[in-house]
């Protein structure tokens, strides 16, 4: 039986959250270590409309944990486990930096062209799911180079996808490449164009291991009540976190998505109310 230790890197935690983490650890017979991060350490690094400073928790986790463990399965917060992770435990690293999953085909070509690395087309990975060889990471001492990349101090200039670009450049395609079942990218925006709400089954299949919910609308939003989000809800209902309500829209971008999805659900009065709030906030 494999021993698992979970690590959570966050910039916010309170007593209720810590209590829920403790309850989760007891329920699933695991250990959960919570690392509280001060955002000031990322003040000189770039952010964007879609990428906040929280994206740098990824590199921080690699650097910090490489002092004590040899491998790490990193998951973005919007990744949900649907299948068995056992195949990852059977990976034996040689000199590779990580086991990764190629990004969507359209992203592949665009990123290879943008970074002027033609051979990266087909091997540019999505950083939402990375099984990292921390022993190799530690030996290579990558963090100083990554910081230069992130600050735009290399020939690559400013990076559109921030640390995802930087990791792709630094790893230089020295990776084990896995099938997309380990990072099945799905956006709930698709539901706005699929009134049957069943087409997701063409993407999320019986073979899918990890679902990566990209985009503004996440499964934990109150307006995301679709069958495609059920995998998150199943996990939520089996955990202490079910006591917390689903998230409401707070940002302008979330409000815009909320009213559109409410209309898709046929909740027209709520949708109109949400639309008015969006217009006023905008």
Model region roles, listed by residue range:
Residues 136-282:
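A glycosyltransferase accessory/donor-loop signature
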């Amino acid at each position: 039986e494999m021993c698992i230790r979970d690590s959570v890197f966050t910039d916010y935690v309170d007593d209720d959250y810590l209590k829920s983490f403790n309850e989760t650890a007891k329920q699933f017979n695991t250990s959960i270590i919570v690392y509280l991060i001060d955002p000031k350490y990322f003040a000189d690094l770039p952010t964007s409309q879609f990428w906040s400073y929280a994206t740098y928790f990824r590199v921080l986790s690699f650097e910090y944990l490489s002092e004590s463990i040899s491998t790490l399965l990193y998951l973005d917060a919007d990744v949900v486990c649907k299948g068995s992770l056992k195949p990852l435990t059977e990976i034996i690293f040689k000199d590779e930096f990580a086991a990764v999953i190629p990004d969507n085909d359209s992203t592949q070509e665009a990123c290879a062209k943008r970074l002027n690395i033609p051979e990266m087309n087909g091997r540019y990975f999505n950083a939402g799911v990375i099984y990292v060889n921390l022993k190799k990471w530690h030996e290579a001492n990558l963090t100083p180079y990554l910081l230069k990349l992130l600050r735009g101090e290399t020939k690559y200039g400013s990076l559109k996808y921030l640390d995802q670009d930087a990791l792709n450049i630094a790893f230089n395609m020295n990776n084990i490449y896995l099938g997309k079942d380990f990072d099945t990218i799905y956006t709930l925006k698709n539901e706005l164009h699929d009134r049957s709400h069943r087409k997701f089954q063409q993407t999320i299949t019986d073979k899918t291991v990890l679902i990566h919910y990209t985009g503004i609308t996440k499964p934990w939003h109150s307006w995301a009540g679709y069958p495609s989000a059920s995998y998150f809800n199943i996990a939520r209902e089996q955990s202490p976190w079910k006591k917390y309500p689903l998230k409401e829209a707070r940002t302008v971008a979330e409000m815009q998505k909320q009213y559109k999805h409410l209309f898709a659900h046929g909740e027209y009065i709520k949708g109109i109310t949400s639309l008015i709030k969006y217009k006023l906030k905008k």
